[in-house]
Amino acid sequence: MVNFNQFLKQAQTMQKKMQEAQEQMANTRYTGKAGGGLVEIIATGKGEVEKVSIDASLLKEEEKEMLEDLIKVAFNDAKQKCDSDSQNSMSGALSGMSLPPGFKMPF
């Protein structure tokens, strides 16, 4: 039988580790690039875009559609890096916690 007090202590430890991981993620910046660096987006761990850099060579009317695509690719690149880092951080926060039989976490 699982010791309930021990389980609660583990849950509190896990909660603290997850909060620390979330704070670290919020303070991390991710850079997404597209078009060989012609478009660059810097996003926070919360998924907020902080900066968009566009090479001057793309600022032509005939390049509008390509520029729009590159911005989308750069943003998705930054978001993928953030999501991957978030998954790794949460996995680390949960490591070592023994859960009761049949109890599954949502991630």
From Swiss-Prot:
Chain spans, region Disordered: 81-107
Annotated GO MF terms: DNA binding
Protein's cellular compartments: Cytoplasm, Nucleoid
Pfam families: YbaB_DNA_bd
Protein keywords: Cytoplasm, DNA-binding
GO CC entries: bacterial nucleoid; cytosol
SUPFAM superfamilies attached to this UniProt entry: YbaB-like
InterPro entries cross-referenced by the UniProt entry: YbaB-like_sf, YbaB/EbfC
HAMAP family in UniProt: DNA_YbaB_EbfC
Protein family membership: Belongs to the YbaB/EbfC family.
Subunit structure: Homodimer.
Function of the protein: Binds to DNA and alters its conformation. May be involved in regulation of gene expression, nucleoid organization and DNA protection.
Protein name: Nucleoid-associated protein A1I_00660
Organism: Rickettsia bellii (strain OSU 85-389)
